[in-house]
From Swiss-Prot:
Domain Ig-like V-type: 1-104
Name of the protein: Ig kappa chain V region Mem5
Sequence segments annotated as region (Complementarity-determining-1): 24-34
Framework-3 as annotated region, ranges: 57-88
Region entry Framework-2, spans: 35-49
Residue segments, region Complementarity-determining-3: 89-97
Length: 121
């Protein structure tokens, strides 16, 4: 089986940033790679096919590149709705195999603050 490795388990970003999600195939898969976006409680949404082609309706801030064994999904001008998990998949050879996923999350400084109220001592 072809192993798809996503070495970045998490990527921290801010709204407006540009981020790159990487994926490496254990053998040459040409450009037979797709990318998916997965949000909690939702089905995976196809983003890219054949490494660099966007599905209809996918914003053009998503771009894909690569061939052979090394692939990248780049998100320019990250929006809050882009905070999700991203998976690569090879369809060069059966069985079709997926990467383990990269979760895009807000940098801690950008996350909403939490307030704790303690009773008087």
């Amino acid at each position: 089986d072809i192993l798809m490795t996503q070495s970045q388990k998490f990527l921290s970003t801010s709204v407006g940033d540009r981020v790159s999600v990487t994926c490496k195939a254990s053998q040459n898969v040409g450009t037979n790679v797709a990318w998916y976006q997965k949000k909690p409680g939702q089905s995976p949404k196809p983003l890219m096919y054949s490494a660099s082609y966007r599905y209809s309706g996918v914003p053009d801030r998503f771009t894909g590149s690569g061939s052979g064994t090394d692939f990248t999904l780049t998100i320019s001008n990250v929006q809050s709705e882009d905070l999700a998990e991203y998976f690569c998949q090879q369809f060069n050879r059966y069985p079709l195999t997926f990467g383990s996923g990269t979760k895009l999350e807000l940098k801690r400084a950008d996350a909403a603050p939490t307030v704790s109220i303690f009773p008087p001592s």
